[in-house]
Amino acid sequence: MQTRSWRAVGRAALVCGLSAASLFATEARAETPAERGYRLLSTKAYLAPDFDQEVFDQLWMTWEEPLRSEAEAAGADERRRMAFSRYGLTEAPGRPGPVALQYVDDGRGGWVISCLACHAGKVAGQVIPGLPNSLFALETLTEEVRETKLRLEKPLVRMDLASLGMPLGGSNGTTNAVMFGVLLMAYRDADLNVHRDRPQPEMTHHDHDAPPLWNVKRKKNLYIDGFAPRGHRPLMQFLLEPRNGPERFREWEDEFRDVEAWIESLEAPRYPWAIDIGLAAAGEATFHRVCADCHGTYGPTGRYPERRVPIDESAPIACGSTR
């Protein structure tokens, strides 16, 4: 009797195990577009690598004193932590390997920059994809990568060379990203064919803070002047390095529809600390009175007015103005 009972338990366990295996297989097959978009963004190398692991591991040798001596005396793990802190990099939750979340491993030890370089940040120790990376030091990182490559006699690549004549960002957390797009598009025709003989375009260099991506779904247009309609194609502009021809963009278009789905799936993270309800209510009333006309409102019924406000430098228009 006892033997039959244990056999029944065994059969039940086997059935449960097979059911669980089937469930996990179904879940794997049923990856949503948003999940697929984030997976692609965080694991697929769309560009050539900017540097390799050897270069990254030796960046500390370019640092000023006393930081360089502190790094020299530290172990490899502590030097890595110091480098992540210096350049505004974070660990990649759930992704194995030494490469920071802001980059993708090309499978040969190369670090390939991704959209998450500017669009994955950290607050109070928590890594949040979609949060502006207010700590990213692209200019400093690129300068020190170039110096390290020259010492190691490694070849320079597009980022190392382009940054000699073009500012990448004047402060941590900001980049000259709009001009990156202007420069890359200048050498393409309407069919995205590359024309290397074209002159360099006139550019107005200026730094931008990256926006929080969970607000994108509220907008019809992107950027401060709303000149680009929201969609998956504007997301692809930073892939326009010359080695990526028109056929690559046709191949990748559906993948960036998934990336857009990920962006539109994002919600603002909940504030983790205590809230002064009275003060928040007073702030909400002030925000609706003074700011909401231009900046929109939040919550389940939130709206974004998509206003383009002309700015006369001699008489700037304040938020809430009816002019």
Q: Language-model features: where?
A:
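Electrostatic cytochrome c docking/interface patches
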Residues: 93-106, 261-287, 296-311, 315-316
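Bacterial N-terminal signal peptides
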Residues: 11-22
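N-terminal module-boundary/linker segments of secreted carbohydrate-active enzymes
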Residues: 31-61
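Glycine-rich, acidic and aromatic/proline-enriched surface loops and short helix-turn segments
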Residues: 215-219, 252-265
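Extracytoplasmic redox metalloprotein regions
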Residues: 45-49, 53-54, 65-251
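Boundary at the C-terminal end of the N-terminal hydrophobic targeting segment
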Residues: 25-30
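The canonical Cys-X-X-Cys-His
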Residues: 112-122, 213, 259, 283-298
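N-terminal secretory signal peptides that target proteins for export/translocation
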Residues: 1-8
